[in-house]
């Protein structure tokens, strides 16, 4: 297993929103956390990214509690693209993407040849090379999203967390992003993402984790998980399930 959550409770101030959650994320898969708004998908992802400390329980990676790892060690293992970004003023696109290499820099902070190659590769993957000298703050929302994705790719971590990564992206860019997730998996990485589009989740993801009110309702492959009964129970949706003619995965049409 890539990441294991054991008896985890999470909360903000004195309010618990996740109680006694236990969950295993399979290695080398594209995994989607899905569920209605407020079901704690992003909260769970933040805990795995070490942005939210558990009230109780543990999260382990490679058998070691993630809070026992140094920030640099964990940043070499895990890259996280949050749902919302703080866009720094006065920084150019290529500079921001190069920040993805920060966990690997020496005391002098100089990029190695490998670092520079990974930055160039990440820009090519996200089609941001033509934006390299522009200020990030001057870009559109969709362009900024691609730049932050490039920074995440440049980090070259084996575990990649993407919180609602299709935000601000048009349909063409969304399809490209989904293709990149598949490519990362084929290159040996584990991708965990929060998605709202159920048809996208079924077409592009190997493993689905369905959440409701901070609890896991079901998990498995799209064919194992996505039933008309579950969609009614979790999302209050009345649907007809067909087969996607492209991927042969479940596809949903509202009644």
Q: Model regions: which residues?
A:
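Catalytic Walker B motif of ABC-type/P-loop ATPase nucleotide-binding domains
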Residues: 160-164
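Helix-to-loop junction immediately C-terminal to a conserved catalytic motif
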Residues: 49
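Conserved ABC transporter NBD signature motif
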Residues: 57-65, 73-74
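Conserved ABC ATPase signature
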Residues: 110, 135-139
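The feature captures the beta-strand-to-loop junction immediately N-terminal to the Walker
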Residues: 34-36
């Amino acid at each position: 297993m890539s990441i294991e959550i054991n008896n985890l409770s999470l909360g903000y101030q004195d309010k618990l929103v996740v109680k006694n959650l236990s969950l295993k994320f399979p290695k080398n898969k594209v995994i989607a956390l899905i569920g209605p708004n407020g079901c704690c998908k992003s909260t769970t992802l933040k805990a795995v990214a070490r942005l939210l400390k558990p009230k109780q329980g543990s999260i382990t990676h490679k058998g070691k509690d993630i809070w026992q790892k140094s920030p640099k060690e964990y940043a070499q293992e895990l890259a996280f693209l949050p749902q919302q970004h703080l866009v720094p003023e006065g920084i150019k696109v290529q500079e921001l993407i190069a920040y993805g290499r920060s966990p690997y820099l020496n005391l002098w902070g100089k990029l190695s040849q490998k670092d520079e190659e990974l930055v160039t590769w990440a820009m090519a993957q996200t089609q941001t090379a033509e934006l390299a000298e522009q200020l990030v703050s001057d870009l559109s929302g969709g362009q900024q999203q691609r730049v932050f994705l490039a920074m995440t790719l440049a980090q070259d971590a084996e575990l990649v967390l993407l919180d609602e990564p299709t935000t601000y992206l048009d349909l063409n860019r969304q399809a490209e992003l989904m293709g990149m997730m598949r490519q990362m998996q084929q290159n040996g990485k584990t991708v965990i993402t929060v998605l709202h589009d159920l048809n996208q989740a079924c077409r592009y993801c190997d493993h689905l984790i369905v959440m409701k009110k901070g609890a896991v309702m079901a998990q498995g492959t799209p064919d194992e998980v996505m039933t008309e009964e579950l969609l009614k129970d979790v999302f209050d949706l009345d649907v007809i399930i067909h087969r996607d003619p492209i991927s042969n995965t479940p596809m949903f049409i509202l009644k």
